[in-house]
Amino acid sequence: MVGITSFGAYVPRLRLQRKAIVDAHVWADPGLAGKARGERSMCNWDEDPVTMGVEAARACLNSSESAPGGIYFASTSAPFADRQNAGILAGALGLPEEIASVDITASQKAGTGALLQAIGGVGGGLYEEALVVASDKRRTKAASPGELAYGDGAAAMTIGSSETLVDFVAAHSATVDFIDHFRGSGEDFDYTW
């Protein structure tokens, strides 16, 4: 049965205290005061979704004896629009050039989409094992709900059919154009209601 065979994660060490965000903007939006607890992860100047993805994938592949046949990179904030980010990951991880690589972007469903594609690839016999990496460094408007909620980080997992930690039993997808937020091409920030 196809399922998750290993996993890894990377969360940047740098933290942003939510209280610092609220203190800077509470004069304009007093409602922020109730969200001042805790902290969120934040990339340092030399971190981006690809570098975080490499670290998560290294943690994931540590116990793997063979190279995956496919790599899926999912992100809404990939550093390159016209260069394959999954290819950069494959090179940084020392994976063979024959690996199939795919970038899945432009939706917050990119991670689950990549996971389902990898499950389909392994289940359909395209390759024995696939690597899925989801990583984001979301830019947000100052004092927006996103600035308080989003944290930077990456997760990786291998999908295979032997020695699974978690078996894939079923999936259900729904596709509805529900516009609660969006980010247009060329825009830096999400538009939210």
Where are these regions (language model features)?
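Short coil/turn connectors at secondary-structure junctions
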Residues: M1-V2, S66-G69, P96-I99, G124-A130, ...
